[in-house]
Design a protein with these regions (language model features):
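Anion-binding alpha/beta catalytic cores of soluble intermediary-metabolism enzymes, centered on
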Residues: 1-306
Length: 306
């Protein structure tokens, strides 16, 4: 099975995020599942790994293009920053963003105490995943277009076919608009439910997917309802995927670090699941006619040669 290149970026200056990332990638199953590309400074990786006993190899490479299987590939971000300062880089984007744009990596996972709302601003679609629940954000300005994007993402990337979906909103304005679009898409929508009441009564257990029309309120309620609430997935207009481990907001005391690691691992697994799901979906929806044409043509040519 194909192994995808997943870029992982610990927050700059956050040794805890970097240490957690290194510990996660040292687990043997990670390099069996994917090709991890760690964007971090060589100095920090070597310092934090000092004294670690691990069978996982960390290989320092100049770029993600050279990343290979059976090891953790480290792209030295301090070197990339020096080259950018020297004017050797045409793009002002961070190296990991450039690699995602150019197809050198298949997905990106950003680790650390980032403002997820700010990071996902302008994304084409945003989905939150916890252990059992899935919540997608739907903008009010262009409901029909937003619903179509979300339903397509759920079916293509997360294998939700005709899910039972609950609309949570603090008003039923525009209800006729989204009901008409849902009927056109063949989606099963229920609601709208008041956001806070919906989560207080744990009604999310009765549905496969939550569609949130009031993102700010819904995000807070979703996070509080989840035990270790998992992952935020954002897709841009070109279909590129970035995931954010969304650390538990509940005080966990000494267990906080372990729950954060669970969230990070879930983000890595989710990245692979999304890419595999997308490939399977695209393969199933690709017309077989071009392939048949070339196969038949080759058969005819072979027959003529004989």
């Amino acid at each position: 099975m194909k192994r995808y290149k997943i870029g992982i970026v610990p927050a700059a200056g956050d040794d805890a995020a970097s240490l957690m990332t290194i510990a996660s990638l040292e687990e043997p199953q990670m390099t069996d599942l994917l090709i991890p590309v760690l964007y971090d400074s060589k100095e920090r990786v070597e310092r934090l790994r000092e004294g670690h006993e691990s069978d996982t190899r960390f290989v320092f490479l100049p770029s993600a293009e050279e990343a290979r299987e059976e090891c953790v590939c480290v792209v030295d971000t301090s070197r990339a920053a020096q080259e950018a300062d020297a004017g050797d880089t045409a793009s002002a984007l961070p190296v990991w963003q450039s690699d995602l744009r150019d197809g050198n990596i298949d997905a990106l996972v950003l680790v650390g105490d980032a403002d997820i709302d700010q990071c996902t601003d302008g994304a084409s679609a945003v989905v939150y995943l916890s252990e059992a629940d899935c919540m997608a954000l739907v903008g009010r300005e262009h409901i029909a277009e937003e619903l179509e994007k979300v339903v397509r993402l759920l079916e293509r990337d997360l294998d939700y076919s005709k899910p039972r979906m609950a609309v949570v909103a603090d008003t039923d304005r525009q209800k006729e608009e989204w009901e008409a679009k849902a009927e056109e898409l063949g989606a099963f929508l229920y609601g709208p439910f008041l956001t806070e009441t919906f989560f207080e009564e744990e009604q999310q257990r009765n549905f496969d997917v939550i569609l949130a029309f009031d993102p700010a309120t819904a995000r807070n309620c979703f996070r509080e309802a989840a035990h270790a609430w998992g992952v935020c997935l954002a897709e841009d207009g070109e279909g590129r995927v970035t995931l954010y481990p969304a650390y538990n907001t509940q005080p966990m005391g000494e267990d906080a670090a372990s729950f954060n690691a669970i969230s990070l691992n879930r983000a890595l697994y989710s990245a692979v699941d999304v890419l595999r799901g997308r490939a399977r979906y695209d393969e199933g929806h690709t017309s077989p006619l071009p392939k048949l044409f070339y196969e038949r043509r080759d058969e005819r040519r072979g027959g003529n040669i004989e």
